[in-house]
Curated annotation (Swiss-Prot):
Keywords: Amino-acid transport, Cell membrane, Ion transport, Membrane, Sodium, Sodium transport, Symport, Transmembrane, Transmembrane helix, Transport. It comes from Staphylococcus aureus (strain USA300 / TCH1516). The gene is putP. It is a multi-pass membrane protein. Catalyzes the sodium-dependent uptake of extracellular L-proline. Since most S.aureus strains are L-proline auxotrophs, this transporter may aid the bacterial persistence during an infection of tissues with low proline concentrations. Its main location: membrane. One of its GO terms (molecular function) is proline:sodium symporter activity. It catalyses: L-proline(in) + Na(+)(in) = L-proline(out) + Na(+)(out). Belongs to the sodium:solute symporter (SSF) (TC 2.A.21) family. This is Sodium/proline symporter.
Length: 512
């Protein structure tokens, strides 16, 4: 039998072509990073947001690639392999959430962030939108980004380490350091432009991989009859409701709520050349997402028949895609498919590093140095941004050094944190003139705290009553909405300029 750390690694070791393909992939990323560095002007907005000059297709695939991460290629197939089609509820929720995000958030955010002092980060937008002269809102939202994104980034590093450990039998820590080095290099030097171009490139690779693997697997098994074989082996795995209560379905479906507040995703909307390009981005982005997620589900289902057919002992379901790519394909193609996993992992890490870096630079360092210094010392701020990338990466690597949770759980916790603290605030800021600074701060903090409390103390009580097992984004989101609204109603109304700006944003968005 093949096991993930022994026979399979020996097979890969014998095929040097696989290493060549991985090396070529890394080289391409380094070249793109160097290109981004050569295009840099020393302007902070250019480094952090690409000068708001990104086209619709790069916007679409970079948003998708940075969103899906290693979860789409490793986490989701593993979940479907283990539990069956019931895992599809999360894909339905995500696709619907992303689709709504393009309509509800994207156009207004692109217009409003430029109108509100040309904000290049979410905290900066919140500050300008709510006239936060004391920077309380900016500091708190910046802290939430730094804390949750460090957690989120470390999950990506865990995926990278797992990949090299599983596919090549290499030390987990070696894989962790290698992935970190490449990501840090092109993010550090190339900034937002390099990250966006690499994400587009990586998005293409991911899509090809998610289509190829299940199709070739079925061709090598029993064609479309593979699904009949799966039904015979594990009939309940084709049941959408297997092992799920109403609470379980709602929890999976509710992942879509998080889209409105994920900084590394909605920053893509802020950087597109014009809000008028967003429909093109939406069509490509949602199509890419739907095909990719369906491919991931297909990998998990075909894996149920594949593993026993090839006499494989699968110790970790999240390595299913790795096993299939190495057993089914020529080493060169297998190397390409491993590069697809790296693409999924690294595209998310780089985006998260850059957003965290921009928050540390724009939302904290600028407060120390002052607005005037920021205008006259742009190169200094770009360098601080680069150093912030390095610092955040080192902290995330340290946390990832001893992994003790599944990829899906790690991502789920961070996703809920942003979804509960930022999603309601983003929606209120874009649509409601009655939002106040006190309401924004209270809602944001309460949402984040509810998520933390739910994870730490409420979820462990799920064995007592299943309601306690509810995905933490739901109670966090609800509490944040209520607190934001109530506190805003009880505090001083914002100035008339808010209604004027909201009307202006609405009119611009309606322009054809």
């Amino acid at each position: 039998m093949l096991t993930m750390g022994t026979a399979l690694s020996q097979q890969v070791d014998a095929n040097w072509q696989t290493y060549i393909m991985i090396a070529v992939y890394f080289l391409i990323l380094i070249v793109i990073g160097f290109y981004g560095y050569k295009q840099a002007t020393g302007n902070l907005s250019e480094y952090m947001l690409g000068g708001r000059s990104i086209g619709p297709y790069i916007t679409a695939l970079s948003a998708g690639a940075s969103d899906m991460s290693g979860w789409m290629i490793m986490g989701l197939p593993g979940s479907v392999y283990s539990t069956g089609l019931s895992a599809m509820w999360i894909t339905i929720g995500l696709t619907l959430g992303a689709y709504i995000n393009y309509f509800v958030v994207a156009p207004r955010l692109r217009v409003y962030t430029e109108l509100a002092g040309d904000a290049i980060t979410l905290p900066d937008f919140f500050k300008n939108r709510l006239n936060d002269k004391n920077n309380v809102l900016k500091i708190i939202s910046g802290l939430i980004i730094v804390v949750f994104f460090t957690l989120y980034t470390h999950s990506g590093f865990v995926s990278g380490g797992k990949l090299f450990e599983s596919a090549f039998g290499l030390d987990y820590h070696f894989g962790l350091i290698l992935v970190a080095f490449i990501v840090i290099f092109y993010t550090f030097f190339g900034g937002y432009l390099a990250v966006s171009i690499t994400d587009f490139f990586q998005g293409v690779i991911m899509l090809i991989a998610m289509v190829m693997v299940p199709i070739v697997a079925m061709m090598n098994l029993n064609g479309w009859g593979t699904f009949h074989d799966v039904a015979a082996m594990k009939p309940t795995n084709l049941n959408l409701f297997k092992g799920l209560s109403f609470i379980g379905i709602i929890s999976l479906f509710s992942w879509g709520l998080g889209y409105f507040g994920q900084p590394h995703i909605i920053i893509r909307f802020m950087s597109i050349k014009s809000h008028k390009m967003l429909p093109k981005a939406r069509r490509l982005g949602i199509s890419w997402m739907a095909v990719g997620l369906l491919g991931a589900v297909a990998v998990g289902l075909t894996g149920i028949a594949f593993v026993p057919a090839y006499h494989i002992k699968l110790e970790d379901p999240e390595t299913l895609f790795i096993v299939m790519s190495q057993v089914l394909f020529h080493p060169l193609v297998g190397g390409f498919l491993l590069a697809a996993i790296l693409a999924a992992i690294m595209s998310t890490i780089s985006s998260q590093l850059l957003v965290t870096s921009s928050s540390l630079t724009e939302d904290f360092y600028k407060l120390i140095r002052g607005e005037e210094k920021a205008k006259t010392h742009q190169k200094e701020f770009v360098m601080i941004g680069r150093l912030s990338v390095l610092v955040v990466a080192i902290v995330a690597i340290a946390i990832a050094w001893n992994p003790n949770d599944t990829i899906l759980n790690l991502v789920g916790n961070a996703w809920a944190g942003f979804g509960a603290s930022f999603s309601p605030l983003v929606l209120f800021a874009l649509y409601w003139k009655g939002l106040t600074r006190a309401g924004a701060v209270s809602g944001m903090v309460s949402g984040a705290l509810v998520v933390i409390v739910w994870i730490a103390w409420i979820k462990p009580l799920a064995h007592i009553n299943e309601i306690f097992g509810l995905y933490e984004i739901i109670p966090g989101f609800i509490v944040s909405v209520i607190v934001t609204y109530v506190v805003s109603k009880l505090t001083k109304k914002p100035g008339a300029f808010v209604e004027t700006d909201l009307n202006k944003v609405r009119d611009i968005v309606r322009e054809k």
